[in-house]
């Protein structure tokens, strides 16, 4: 799953957060309200792949060891985004 277009959507909609969770569509938070990006229910594999796509090798090693990770990424022309990835009920969220 390519997450980067969702960062562009966040900037366009002035969203403060982007959420991925298994068995639910991706959601964004705008003015305190959480709303789905689309109707596609994400599988656990899709959520995990989306998270891994954003990590470098060292971050992936840390996440694999600690089962949680906080980091930031910069997208040219869009800005800097803070990322929190963790395990919840056996799945990546």
Please provide the spans of the model-predicted regions.
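N-terminal "pre-motor" subdomain/linker immediately upstream of P-loop NTPase catalytic cores
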Residues: 1-93
């Amino acid at each position: 799953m390519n997450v980067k277009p969702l960062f562009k959507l966040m900037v366009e909609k002035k969203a403060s957060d982007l959420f991925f969770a298994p068995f639910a569509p991706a959601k964004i938070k705008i003015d305190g309200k959480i709303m789905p990006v689309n109707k596609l229910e994400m599988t656990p594999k899709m959520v995990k792949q989306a998270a891994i796509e954003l990590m470098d090798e060292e971050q992936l090693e840390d996440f694999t060891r600690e089962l949680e990770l906080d980091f930031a990424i910069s997208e040219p022309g869009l800005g800097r985004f803070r990322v929190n990835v963790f395990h919840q009920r056996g799945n990546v969220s």
